[in-house]
Structure formats: C-alpha cells, structure tokens
C-alpha cells in the first residue's frame, strides 16, 4: 500500500487520518500543531489528529513552524508516495511538497476556487450559501491554488452551523480522498486548473467579525451566530458586557422597534434588528455563565427587562 506523511490538526483531519489508517495506507509520519494550554487552569490540550496518531502508535511531529525546523529535515528523508493535508494550519515549504513521489494532496473544505484560505466553512455559513463541499487538490506554493483532482457538493441547511458542517465535510472529504488516491496509482486521475477569475478568499475570522451589531438584519446576525458556532461564538454587548448567542432564528414578522430593542421576553426572547427584522434568541451565554437555553435565561436574568429596553449596546 502507498506510503503517506499526514498533516492535520482538528477533528476534520482526524477523521481523514482514521480513514487512511483503516484503508491500510502506510502512515510514515503524522505532523500536527503543538499542544496548547487552554482554559483558566491552563490544561494541556492535544490536537484530535495527535490523539488518533498516538492511538495507532504512529510517529508524531509537532513543530511550531515547519519551515526551517529540525522536524522538516527528518520528514524530507522519508520521501513518501503521498503528502496529505487536512486542516493542518501552516504553510508547507515547496521543497517538502516536492519530496512526495506521487503527489502532495490537500482535502479542502469548500468548492474551490470559492473560499481559498483558513475559514472556508465559516464563510459559507456567514454568507448564507445554499451549498458547500470538499475539494481534493494538489498542493502548490500559492495557498489553495493547485489543480483540482475531485470535488463533491453538500447542501447547507438552515439548521447547520460551522460545527455540523465540519463533521459532515470531514466524512465527505475522507470518502472522496479514499476514492481519489487509487486513481493516481492506476493513472486515471484527472486534474482541472482553477479559474482565477472566480477566486474568493476566506481569511481567518478576526475578533472584530465576532460582534453582532445594529446594522445587521436578523438573517445576517443569525448567519454570523451559526458561522461562529462552536468556536469562538458570536456576541453583542449588553450593559457593557459580552453576551454570547449560540442559537437563534430570524422571524418573518416585522417590528417598528428600533434595532437592538427588546420586542418581548414573555416565554421567548426577541430583539429587533436592522430593517425592522426580528431575531429570537434560543441559546445564550451571559458573561461568567455557562451556555443556557432561553427558558432558563428567562427564568432568571432575562425576566428583569421591560419591552422596549435597549438590549444591544451601540
């Protein structure tokens, strides 16, 4: 079976790696991001890809930066058939990509050339797209610009979040990769150059983009909430403090209340947004609290507001 160096970090990559292992590919090395300390207690957190690799006793490399590292020198000596990446999170040196005997292949979470970059899944939700998908592509020096070997589309439902799409696309990407790799060996793989006129970029989500503001319609705010679930979460400022919203739904009825105002807190919590639109909050997280459904919030803090109160700070 073909030999592989695999590079990936989150669960998206872990699902792909597990598929390669189960199909009998010879995994020569696994490269993932360094362990992180998370939370108030600074607990050391390993990536999902590292956990999968250790479970199967595979050699793991975790350079802070692959370029110019000692780890890179070791990896260059392996010369595998394939170098495969799935949500690794670093640029790869061209000389390393060229060390693959057959091809350097990436599993990308969008229908390229739409959404090159680090947050393709988030942008598909943020922009209200009706479909997304995965692309199996050649890795080249320029980010996500290589030829396309295979693509498969996936509908986006109104209930989907980035989290649910990550899960769906990891399985779709795994299956499409495993379907495509044998075509390299038997010579039936096809390649299609990307149309540079149709390129759309999806840079990593910035801190400024996390905030729900008064210029957004209910639909736009809901798209942001879905796009940033499960991480980092969308928020607005309420009484000078962050108030995260994990789940909401836009209502069809219009209101005359100005944007950012409480429309009702009787059995449900509805706020007005731009253009007279209304957003019903379903799952929230006030600063210093755990996530809660809106019923629990209305039984406590949420009951103290009066219809017409300003909820979203400027």
UniProtKB/Swiss-Prot annotation:
Signal peptide: none
Pfam family, one: Formyl_trans_C
Catalytically driven reaction(s): L-methionyl-tRNA(fMet) + (6R)-10-formyltetrahydrofolate = N-formyl-L-methionyl-tRNA(fMet) + (6S)-5,6,7,8-tetrahydrofolate + H(+)
Keyword terms, alphabetized: Protein biosynthesis, Transferase
Sites where the protein binds (6S)-5,6,7,8-tetrahydrofolate: 110-113
GO molecular function: methionyl-tRNA formyltransferase activity
Enzyme nomenclature, EC number: 2.1.2.9
HAMAP family noted in UniProt: Formyl_trans
Family affiliation: Belongs to the Fmt family.
Protein's UniProt name: Methionyl-tRNA formyltransferase
Organism: Lactobacillus johnsonii (strain CNCM I-12250 / La1 / NCC 533)
Protein's gene: fmt
